[in-house]
Amino acid sequence: FILSGAGLSAESGIPTFRDANGLWRKYDPKELASIGSLERHTQDVFDFYNERIKNAEPCRPNAAHIAIAEFQKDVAAFCDVIHVTQNVDNLNELAGSPRVFHLHGDFQTSLCRKCKKTFPRIGFYQREQVCPVCGANNFAVRPNVVLFGEVPHGMDWIPLYLKKASVFISVGTSGTVYPAADFVRETKASLRINLDLDPLIHPYSKFNHRVFGKCTETLPP
């Protein structure tokens, strides 16, 4: 079981949320990334995510993304590897990862607030955008990302995989965002590895192997 976070994509140019220069230092998440704000200040939320999407588009996978993808391919014949990422970019897919699940949604798909269907994103978000499934508009089409106040994706089946996993690897995540922060405590894996940049963010008491440094330095062979 691989869990990845913002630190994995930071070296590709996508800003993290909680470091010294992170997004939450510039914006109040309660204002721009919550379900309540989507209802009350829809255009502001759309502008925020349009900017994030625009900034992410030129970014490319780094050596750590590629290392994870190659690892998944190398062990696929004899080991079932599930990669759950907290990132909303598609750099893991671009690197060739055969199996990636986005816990917090992704930038590549949109969600209709009326019919609840998801579909490939087309351009940037605006009031006039029409849902290709039901035809709704007037801010009906929103980013398919998990906002504060919403339940992360996959929580109906992820706990089952955590209990079955023999190895748990955490890559580039601060371990402060729930429910993902609890995954290392929920897993039955005998080997629990943490690969992260800052060892001082929180105590890694449940990990039994730790490697501190940039993902591009700690992951590639």
Regions found by a protein language model. Give the residues of each.
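Conserved catalytic core of sirtuin-type NAD+-dependent deacylases
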Residues: F1-P221
